[in-house]
Regions:
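Short amphipathic alpha-helical segment within the helicase RecA-like ATPase core
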Residues: 1-238, 242-245
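A generic structural signal for tightly packed, nonpolar segments enriched in small/aliphatic residues
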Residues: 1-5, 26, 47, 181-483
Length: 483
């Protein structure tokens, strides 16, 4: 899809169709379509297509960024069914020009996304050219340079999300740890600013990453430790992301019920997001050094599987009592977070589809932000609200820490209570964060929104790219803050 920002009036732009945005249900001035409005009982809500005049009317509920995204996503979904190649629209400017244009582009691209790789009959859209006029729907004047920046951001954010979604949607017989490593290498091959190192089992043994290795033990596919890095000249700070890359999670010997095993290809969403963030950071030419460490493995069953009652010694030297092999992601993350701290980051963020408890507590649309530093959490939350990724803060409760105590090891991998599971999982990870990084670490549990079993908002069925936009937005925020 190509986006063309035109410093021209809307009427001077040639396109197959025009999008007209309806605010406050005010449709009276569009005289050319009044007869259609009456026949279709269109009152200014939702979508109405005037084929005769080549106009699509789309409701814009407000100038909030989420409404801008939803409006253009709905418009594209309706238009892609038509035999057209181009469309034009006026600009929409809310509180911030950059964020508004970013939202417009995201709306179009999220509306266009579809994972149909395995469908025999595909219905590709011919709509490729999007023309955006300098004319603003409310006749606002605005900085055209900022508009172009917003369009660029929108394309980078959207491409990064699509990259992550394609990884998460890919099927488990194809998407093994080796395939994840291959995709990581392709990022470095296609972008000279990104470097990639892939580490095998022998490295994990050498580094004493026994928690990570235990999870992989019953899989026929060897584990991969992926380290992507983007290093600009004279970086202002260093940020390290750690992603959970479970390419499939059967639950191990604590086997998941059949219904719960469906969608477990999505347990690599955190790893996919970490890879996509590196891609986006490079395309944005950020002045921040960014690393992504991904622990890629399967969690399978077999005679060699790790077991409940096992005690594992992590890379940090912290011993872990295994009470449930389906709480495996935190074991992989524990060792990966240990390695990440050796990079001496100014900020450390992990992303993981970690707990069903997070979905129970927050619903299917919202990620959880956890950590020890309230100021850091609040900063991240404020930025996330504008990004399109829904998130909220879950505070650590010291009383819940008692629930992951073990009688035979330093910590248990599951809580002794069925309640507060999202927070106890975060507290488990906190056990592997060194004192000097406690206030520099955030844990993002993206279990709810990472994979959608039904479409909602501007998201299609399947992977959503959860975490990518809020992390890229936060990197941009940090870059501006350092200047």
């Amino acid at each position: 899809m190509t986006f063309n920002f035109k410093e021209e009036t809307i009427n001077s732009i040639n396109a197959d169709f025009e999008i007209i945005l309806i605010q406050d249900k005010k449709i009276e001035k569009y005289t050319q379509s009044q007869e259609l409005f009456k026949l279709s009982n269109y009152k200014g809500e939702g979508i109405c297509i005037d084929m005769q005049n080549k106009i699509l009317y789309s409701e814009l509920k407000s100038l909030e960024y989420e409404d801008i995204r939803l409006t253009f996503a709905n418009a594209y979904k309706a238009l892609k069914k038509l035999e057209i190649q181009s469309v034009k629209t006026k600009s929409v400017v809310g509180k911030c020009v950059v964020n508004s244009f970013n939202a417009m582009i995201q709306g179009f691209t999220f509306g266009a996304y579809e994972f149909d790789k395995y469908k025999k009959e595909k219905t590709p859209s011919k709509l490729e050219n999007i023309f955006i006029s300098k004319d603003e729907i409310n006749d606002k004047t605005y900085n055209l340079e900022e508009a172009c920046i917003g369009i660029n951001y929108g394309q980078v954010f959207s491409n990064a999300c699509d990259f992550a979604k394609n990884i998460v949607n890919e099927i488990p017989q194809i998407y093994t740890p080796a395939k994840m490593a291959e995709d990581a290498l392709s990022l470095s091959q296609n972008d000279c600013k990104i470097s990639c190192k892939i580490y095998e089992s022998d490295f994990l043994e050498q580094e004493k990453m026994q928690a990570f290795l235990a999870v992989n033990r019953a899989s026929i596919h060897p584990p991969k430790l992926i380290h992507l890095s983007y290093k600009p000249q004279n970086p202002k700070m260093k940020v390290v992301f750690v992603g959970k890359g479970l390419t499939y999670d059967s639950g191990g010997l604590s086997l998941k019920p059949a219904d719960y095993m469906l969608t477990m290809k999505s347990d690599k969403s955190g790893g996919a997001a970490a890879m996509a963030i590196i891609k986006g950071a490079s395309e944005l030419n950020l002045d921040i050094e960014v690393h992504s460490i991904i622990g890629a493995t399967e969690n399978m069953i077999g005679g060699n599987a790790y077991k409940p009652d096992d005690v594992l010694i992590s890379r940090e030297g912290v011993s872990i009592e295994v009470r449930n092999t389906d709480a495996e992601g935190r074991l992989v993350l524990a060792d990966c977070l240990s390695l990440a701290q050796d990079l001496k980051p100014d900020l450390l963020i992990d992303l993981a589809t970690l707990t069903g408890a997070c979905v129970v507590g927050l619903g299917e649309y919202t990620s959880a932000i956890m950590g020890n530093n309230e100021d850091l959490q609040n900063d991240f939350f404020k930025v996330s609200k504008k990004s399109g990724d829904l998130a909220t803060i879950l505070h650590f409760n010291p009383h819940l820490k008692e629930l992951i105590k073990s009688n035979i090891a330093d910590v248990s991998n599951t809580s002794s209570s069925r309640y507060g599971g999202a927070i106890t999982a975060g507290l488990f990870l906190n056990s592997f964060i060194r004192e000097e990084y406690k206030d520099k670490w955030l844990h993002l549990d993206i279990a709810g929104p990472a994979y959608l079993e039904k479409a909602w908002g501007y998201h299609s069925f399947g992977a959503s790219g959860a975490g990518v936009r809020m992390c890229l937005s936060y990197l941009l925020y940090l870059s501006r803050k350092q200047k």
